[in-house]
């Protein structure tokens, strides 16, 4: 319901407002037309091979320097094409606004990316985030139906002409916004890249790795097409030669994205005349048109693909379209998102400030929150009562959602990601404090995949400038120093950077041997740092553990070896982190399609919050963030909680602890 129109269109929309100067009923809207497939530029025709290649690349975390982020990490169908991790109020998804400080009104809900890393894989300290995962400064828009837009990103900086990211030669004269858009994240040191990464580095990585080596539950048609081939062979089928180039990567990903359009929502059945809306849905649709929403969220795409300032934040916070055009009329203006599948999304607007459609409708009902000369009159208090607001939400949530998108059904099926899987290293307990009473913390995020030449493990919160030792062993290293003199897997000495109590940080880059015999081996690690203020002169971090896995486990890598012969329908994992203060990520896997319920209970067995309620989900890995609140949005007290997953005739329960 973004707004901001030319004078002529604005006058037309104002005629549709609930209160009109001429005291006449608004004219009926023009009939909606069926949504056709998106346009395809002649220079990048769709072929099955190119689409399959693009699908593999889109979901391959190996495209990132850290091997932890794919395009699909931030763009998933089940959350309407946006990022399920991006939830307002979650610390791990919060970036500072223009004031540069966290915890203030201009904070942004973005997408977690990567730890700031140098070209050798060592971690650097980033402003605000330190050695934590950095967060983007805008909320990730949906990739579903993005192919209809002539310009992409919230500010439209991905334009229609696509230039080779290396040579600068024109590849597509028009229609190349998708190709342009997908060239940015793989070289962003916040989203996917190490500092100074060139596109040639990313292409070289892809040329050398096994396709989707980190993925599980690869859709059968895609896995059958890939077979045992490597990327150069896949590029040869898609493009006629085996060259893996940056431009070809972009062309393939864009080809796949052009197949990701949704046109089987209830609104499409209504357009086709095969179904009718309920009275409440009809009332919501009438309000959608009569209140002016349809002016910008126009046509069967429910977007005009234009840019408008609507008062989400002051124009000084984010220049929006102005940064591209230099036109003062574009200050703070953002691209109108399509409202298809909007009910599945976890955050709304370019800054992700709202969690629910109810909040979004309330925002429009009060006429936005800020004003500027370029804010159009159509953004004004609407005077909708609670029933009307609820009807509008029902229309948006129920009528515009394509069930294939919600259920991850083809063409919206996908592999599961390493970052969703239980194979991500787990931070455990223990540790001993050093100077300032601070216990050092380990950083273990990257995949312990056999053959991974750059498995980086970091430390922060120790004494700056101190000597530190990383120990990784088959048994958990002791929780207090000194560091063991030897280890079965790795023992590495590091001089920490930084100065002062709790300011020391460092990392080391290890190689996971390409040895199949290691698959299934659980290893445990801990850091030790010299510190005269620590007991015995040595502080120690919490322990961490991980299981070495092999490529393309198809879900088997997520099941303990002893259980692999035991049929099961689902697997529930401990929350990350546990214990937790602000939020915990609950991951689970389904080995068969099932109607799923995931419920949080307190220590007395009382239901606290239903996180998933009867949704039918396809086989794959899923994750849900619990923000430590009950069903009414109130923070729960510290203590023990249980969450239970039920589906396909089975169930599992896991314990977690909420801290103050």
Spell out what each predicted region is.
Residues 2-57, 80, 189, 193, ...:
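Post-cleavage N-terminal segment of exported redox proteins
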Residues 557-601, 610, 647:
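Glycine-centered coil/turn sites that cap beta-strands in beta-rich domains
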Residues 455-462, 584-590, 626:
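Aromatic/hydrophobic beta-strand junction motif of beta-rich domains
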Residues 470, 527, 556-563, 575-578, ...:
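Terminal processing/anchoring signals of secreted or surface-associated proteins
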Residues 341-413, 460-465, 507-538:
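Extracellular low-complexity, Gly/Ser/Thr-rich intrinsically disordered linkers
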């Amino acid at each position: 319901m973004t707004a901001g129109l030319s004078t002529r269109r604005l006058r037309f929309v104002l005629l549709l407002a609930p209160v009109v100067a001429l005291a006449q009923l608004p004219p009926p809207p023009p009939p909606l037309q069926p949504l056709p497939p998106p346009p395809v530029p002649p220079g990048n025709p769709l072929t099955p091979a190119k689409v399959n290649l693009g699908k593999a690349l889109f979901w391959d975390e190996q495209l990132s320097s850290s091997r932890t982020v794919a395009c699909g990490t931030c763009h998933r169908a089940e959350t309407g094409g946006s990022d399920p991790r991006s939830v307002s109020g979650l610390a791990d998804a919060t970036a500072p606004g223009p004031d540069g400080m966290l915890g203030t009104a201009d904070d942004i809900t973005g997408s977690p990316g990567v730890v700031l890393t140098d070209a050798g894989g060592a971690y650097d300290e980033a402003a605000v985030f330190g050695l934590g995962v950095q967060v983007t400064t805008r909320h990730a828009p949906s990739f579903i139906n993005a192919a209809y837009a002539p310009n992409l990103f919230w500010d439209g900086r991905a334009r229609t002409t696509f230039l080779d990211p290396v040579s600068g030669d024109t590849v597509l004269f028009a229609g190349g916004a998708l190709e342009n858009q997908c060239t940015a994240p793989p070289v962003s040191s916040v989203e996917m890249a190490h500092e100074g990464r060139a596109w040639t580095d990313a292409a070289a990585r892809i040329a050398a790795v096994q396709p989707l080596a980190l993925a599980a539950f690869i859709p059968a048609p895609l896995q059958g097409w890939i077979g045992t081939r490597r990327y150069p062979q896949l590029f040869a089928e898609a493009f006629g030669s085996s060259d893996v180039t940056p431009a070809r990567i972009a062309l393939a990903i864009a080809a796949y994205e052009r197949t990701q359009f949704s046109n089987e929502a209830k609104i499409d059945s209504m357009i086709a005349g095969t179904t009718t809306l309920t009275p409440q849905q009809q009332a919501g649709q009438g309000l959608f048109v009569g209140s002016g929403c349809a002016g910008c969220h126009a046509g069967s795409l429910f977007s005009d693909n234009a840019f408008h300032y609507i008062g989400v934040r002051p124009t000084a916070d984010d220049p929006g379209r102005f940064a591209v055009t230099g036109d003062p009329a574009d200050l703070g203006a953002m691209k109108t998102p399509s409202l298809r599948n909007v009910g599945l999304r976890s955050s709304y607007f370019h800054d992700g400030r709202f969690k629910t459609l109810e909040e979004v409708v309330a925002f429009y009902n009060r006429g936005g929150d800020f004003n500027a000369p370029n804010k159009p009159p159509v953004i004004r208090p609407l005077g909708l009562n609670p029933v009307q607001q609820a009807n509008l939400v029902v229309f948006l949530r129920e009528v515009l959602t394509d069930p294939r998108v919600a259920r991850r059904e083809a063409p919206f099926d996908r592999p599961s990601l390493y970052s969703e899987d239980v194979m991500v290293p787990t931070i455990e307990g223990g540790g001993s404090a050093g100077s300032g009473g601070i216990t050092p913390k380990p950083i273990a995020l990257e995949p312990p995949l056999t053959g991974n030449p750059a498995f980086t493990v970091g430390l922060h919160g120790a004494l700056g400038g101190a000597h530190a030792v990383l120990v990784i062993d088959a048994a958990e290293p002791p929780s207090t120093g000194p560091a063991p003199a030897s280890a079965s897997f790795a023992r590495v000495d590091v001089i920490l950077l930084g100065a002062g109590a709790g300011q020391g940080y460092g990392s080391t880059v290890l190689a996971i041997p390409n040895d199949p015999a290691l698959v299934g081996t659980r290893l445990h690690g801990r850091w030790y740092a010299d510190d005269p203020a620590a007991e015995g002169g040595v502080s120690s971090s919490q322990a961490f553990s991980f299981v070495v896995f092999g490529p393309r486990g198809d879900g088997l890598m997520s099941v303990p070896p002893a259980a692999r012969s035991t049929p099961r329908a689902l697997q529930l994992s401990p929350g990350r982190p546990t214990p937790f203060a602000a939020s915990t990520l609950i991951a689970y896997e389904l080995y068969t399609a099932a109607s799923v319920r995931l419920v949080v209970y307190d220590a007395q067995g009382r239901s606290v919050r239903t996180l998933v309620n009867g949704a039918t989900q396809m086989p794959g890995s899923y994750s849900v963030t619990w923000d430590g609140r009950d069903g009414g949005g109130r923070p729960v007290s510290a203590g023990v909680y249980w969450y239970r997953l039920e589906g396909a005739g089975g169930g599992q329960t896991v314990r977690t602890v909420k801290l103050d």
